[in-house]
């Protein structure tokens, strides 16, 4: 359920790559808060630091400075071992490229992550919700790109996570399939109450968000609440 309860809290987050003359400051003190149950879209051109931001809040990279808290747990203070366990148990990830196991069926690809949770979602209910029940025994190469992305979303969702992080989830899809995936993510947010952060270069997607962040040269240029988000079915680009 959406509300005013802070769920993802980022404070003064910094990251650079390289040293000396090769040093590149990718993020320069990002501070923002995303409330529980919100859909947050982060926009910005290529090279603005969007994917790095997502990797840092998901614990896939280490920050140079600042803090990240999810559901009251400060991830940046955890040991590598504890962070890895928290990430596998509590966070869901959806990437542009699906990285599905080619020799596993659609159902088996989702089951791989189900055991990481003490409270996984019922498999049949999830597969039916994703529109994958009829394809559950097929291999990824036997289904469309949109169905593969649905499987990737299911793999993230089956753990029943509080936070799902999506890096260009429609970047490799055509317009029609992109709309279908966004409608699915909207339904996932509504039915399961998870907080979703979507990183994208497609500004039209921001219209479905409760909160819109815009990165420019590693800095947070905009942090706005969208008072009137539209349904994903109404998006056009």
Report the location of each language-model feature.
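Conserved beta-strand-loop-alpha-helix hinge in the C-terminal portion
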Residues: 219-237
């Amino acid at each position: 359920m959406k509300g005013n309860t802070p769920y993802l809290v980022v404070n003064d987050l910094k990251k650079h790559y390289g040293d000396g003359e090769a040093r590149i400051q990718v993020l320069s003190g990002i501070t923002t808060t995303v409330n529980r149950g919100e859909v947050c879209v982060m926009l910005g051109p290529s090279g603005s630091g969007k994917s790095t931001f997502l990797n840092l809040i998901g614990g896939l990279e280490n920050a140079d400075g600042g803090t990240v808290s999810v559901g009251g747990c400060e991830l940046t203070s955890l040991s590598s071992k504890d962070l890895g366990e928290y990430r596998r148990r509590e966070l869901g990830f959806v990437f542009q490229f699906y990285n599905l196991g080619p020799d596993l069926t659609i159902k088996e690809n989702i089951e791989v992550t189900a055991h990481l949770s003490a409270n996984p979602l019922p498999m049949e209910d999830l597969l039916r919700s994703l529109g994958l029940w009829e394809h559950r025994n097929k291999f990824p190469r036997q289904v469309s790109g949109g169905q593969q992305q649905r499987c990737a979303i299911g793999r993230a969702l089956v753990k029943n996570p509080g936070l799902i992080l999506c890096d260009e989830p429609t970047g490799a899809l055509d317009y029609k399939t992109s709309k279908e995936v966004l409608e699915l993510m909207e339904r996932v947010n509504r039915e399961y109450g998870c907080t979703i952060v979507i990183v994208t270069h497609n500004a039209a997607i921001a219209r479905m968000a409760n909160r819109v962040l815009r990165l420019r040269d590693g800095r947070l240029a905009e942090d706005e609440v969208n008072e009137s988000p539209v349904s994903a079915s109404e998006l056009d680009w």
